[in-house]
A protein has these predicted regions:
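Conserved C-terminal structural/oligomerization subdomain of aldehyde/semialdehyde dehydrogenase
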Residues: 25-29, 217, 254, 308, ...
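Short, well-ordered beta-strand elements within core beta-sheets of diverse protein domains
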Residues: 26-33, 48-54, 138-139, 253-256, ...
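Structural signal for hydrophobic packing residues in well-ordered secondary-structure cores
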Residues: 49, 53, 68-75, 79, ...
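Rossmann-like NAD(P) dinucleotide-binding subdomain of oxidoreductase/dehydrogenase enzymes
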Residues: 116-263, 385
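Residue-level signal for inorganic ion chemistry
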Residues: 24, 60, 82, 161, ...
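N-terminal Rossmann-like NAD(P)+-binding subdomain of aldehyde/semialdehyde dehydrogenases
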Residues: 1-125
Length: 482
């Protein structure tokens, strides 16, 4: 663990084993923190906050750029950890590293986006709005793209002057936190500005509770399941603390009648099966105009069956393992439930160990668990539609709204549909998986609240203060005058 600029053991000296789905074996021994360790990290971040907040935008930007350089320098080692610890395909590991570095370099622009405002005011009064950082921010990140999401969130939070305590997922303590802490150490970032606390599932509840309830914590950033996000939001709300959350998704791709089918198949395959479908913005539903549904489906099935499954160190085999046996069981339950209730399997449906075949379903109905609930694995359903209004009604009826995509013959036609999709993000003539470092990233409905990136990070992780200066012309009632 990394607390106050030092590598420390858990106070209890307890450890847990970090599991590798690639090798189906333990990967590393990790210190297992409890509430006391998190309190220590929060205290360190609190003490570091005044000096960090007082730095100029140029000084904070310089530190963030040094973090990016340190990640780049250690890139080969980090990529190896991404493959071994969470089962990233080698192509994904390189992409995760590249995008993570980009978040820190883009984050160096965010300090300059914090703008004060001068308000029109009565004569004799100077009125202004000042933005200031919040203080210590708790950051909780998931295992599926750990370095990417830890970088996406913390870069903006630190850029505007806050300090951070980060708890990576128990499934990805190395790639979600430890390698990032090493970059902060190498970059010479002042002690206490960025702290990493690791823990096992056994201690998640107490450590997480401390990250919300500790009075020194001023805001919480959480990326993970909607169920846990709701619990955190409820507790934080009772304490009047700001929250920003990116939660589950049930993201839809619409393929209109004049879409380029080849591009649509490519976008669908990447969106549905990248990282074995373990992506929050991955494609889980494909709505295809019935006029082209047969051709699209046939070509999509052929592409899906051709995808390589196996050793993720091999660039030709992009479909790797699910993260753990519990994830496998959940996917199997959703698939069996769908089949038992009448769904048809057009491709896949089998597994060998944690390696689950890319799977395509049709005839999925509302009674099936996979219809409206998040599916965190390589299963996608195809829904032919008659009218776009019908497709939009079904898409928007689901409680999630993270990402979406529309494929059509013209951008204008697709844009009209995109504007009617209830999702925080939507991509025209592209797939659901896409991001840019300074763009606002986040969802609506049960997919979260708040945004990350660029000016959105400024809005989410600073507070407005109204300051006035009286210049001697205000008149009080005479009985109050001295």
């Amino acid at each position: 663990m990394y607390i106050n600029g030092q590598w420390v053991k858990s106070q209890s000296m307890k450890t847990y084993m970090d599991y590798s789905p690639v090798n189906d074996a333990n990967y590393a021994e990790i210190y297992d923190a409890d509430r006391n360790d998190m309190q220590q990290a929060i205290d360190a971040a609190h003490k570091a906050f005044p000096a960090w907040a007082a730095l100029s935008p140029e000084e904070r930007a310089d530190y963030l750029l040094k973090v990016a350089d340190a990640l780049e320098k250690n890139g080969d080692e980090i990529s190896k950890h991404l493959i071994e610890e969470i089962g990233s395909w080698v192509g994904k590991s390189k992409a995760d590293l590249t995008t993570s570095i980009a978040f820190w370099r883009a984050g160096a622009k965010i300090p300059f986006m914090v703008e004060d405002e001068i308000l029109t005011s009565p004569i004799g009064k100077k009125s202004m709005v000042k933005r200031s950082p919040l203080g210590v921010v708790s950051v909780i990140t998931p295992w599926n793209v750990p370095l990417n999401l830890s970088s996406r969130t913390t870069s903006g939070i630190l850029a505007v002057g806050n300090t951070v305590v980060l708890k990576p997922s128990e499934e990805s303590p190395i790639t979600g936190g430890i390698v990032l802490a090493k970059a902060f150490e190498d970059a010479g970032v002042p002690p206490g500005v960025f702290n990493v606390v690791t823990c096992s599932r056994k201690h998640v509840a107490e450590v997480g509770d401390e990250m919300v309830s500790n009075p020194l914590i001023k805001a919480i950033s959480f990326i993970g399941s909607t169920t846990i996000g709701r619990q955190i939001a409820t507790k934080a709300g009772s304490l009047f603390k700001k929250t920003s959350m990116e939660l589950g998704g049930k993201d839809a791709l619409i393929v209109m009648d004049d879409a380029d089918i080849s591009k649509a198949v490519t976008a669908a395959a990447f969106g549905a099966f990248f990282h074995a479908g373990q992506i929050c913005i991955g494609t889980k539903r494909i709505y295809v105009d019935q006029k082209i549904a047969t051709e699209f489906t046939n070509r999509f099935v052929a592409k899906t069956k051709a995808l390589g499954i196996g050793d993720v160190r091999d660039f030709a085999k992009p479909i790797g393992p699910l993260i753990n046996p519990a994830a496998l069981e959940k996917i199997k339950q959703q698939l069996n439930d769908a089949i038992d209730k009448g769904a048809s399997v057009l491709a896949g449906g089998k597994h060998e160990g944690l390696y689950f075949e890319p799977t395509i379903l049709t005839n999925v109905t509302k009674e099936m668990d996979t219809y409206g609930n998040e599916t965190f694995g390589p299963i996608v359903a195809i829904y032919p539609y008659t009218t776009i209004a019908e497709a939009l009604q079904e898409i928007n009826a689901v409680d999630y709204g993270l990402s979406g995509a529309v494929m059509a013959g013209s951008d204008e036609k697709a844009m009209k549909v995109a504007m009617q999709m209830e999702s925080g993000m939507c991509h025209v003539n592209d797939g659901t998986i896409y991001g840019e470092p300074l763009a606002p990233f986040g969802g609506m409905k049960n997919s979260g609240m708040g945004r990350y990136g660029g000016k959105a990070s400024v809005d989410s992780f600073t507070q407005q203060r109204w300051i006035t200066v009286e210049q001697g012309t205000r008149h009080y009632p005479p009985m109050f005058n001295e």
